Amino acid sequence: RVNYGLLPYFDEFWVSDNTDALQRVYMQWGTSYFFPAIAMASHISASPNHQTFRRIPLKYRIDVAMSGRLGMEIQLQDMTTEEKELCKKAIAEYKEIRSVVQFGDIYRLISPYEKQGVASLMYTSPEKDKAVVYWWKLEHFHNQHLHVCSYMV
């Protein structure tokens, strides 16, 4: 699936057939060490996920997909009006940040592999005048403190 030598011939590739947003945080994190976000197809998929059967909120699925090359892998007829509006808003927002995500520099802030229950990364424009920060909760928490992230803007 992922072949660095084929990037001159193809615009994007699938990191995996697994579109479970929680697992994609880990997969896209590792893949980002070798491949740019513009090449990583990252789609919003259905819930429950058809591979893991996990139910993940639409907003979380959108946020994970927006950290790569955003796409939709979801049936519109299966969505509520509110879900369609959320996706419409997300696509409009992605168009605003797309150049930063797809052509910017990546900074890995908190690795999902550090077992802190969160992951975070940031893209900055080459001029360093724009930034996009992603932060994902990776586990369900019951009265636990989450890792505190401070970002200077």
Where are these regions (language model features)?
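Intrinsically disordered, low-complexity regulatory segments enriched
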Residues: 19, 34, 112, 140-141
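Catalytic cores of secreted or luminal carbohydrate-active enzymes
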Residues: 59-111
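Short, Lys/Arg-enriched charge-dense amphipathic segments
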Residues: 9-27, 99-106, 123-138
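Carbohydrate-binding surface patches
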Residues: 113-152
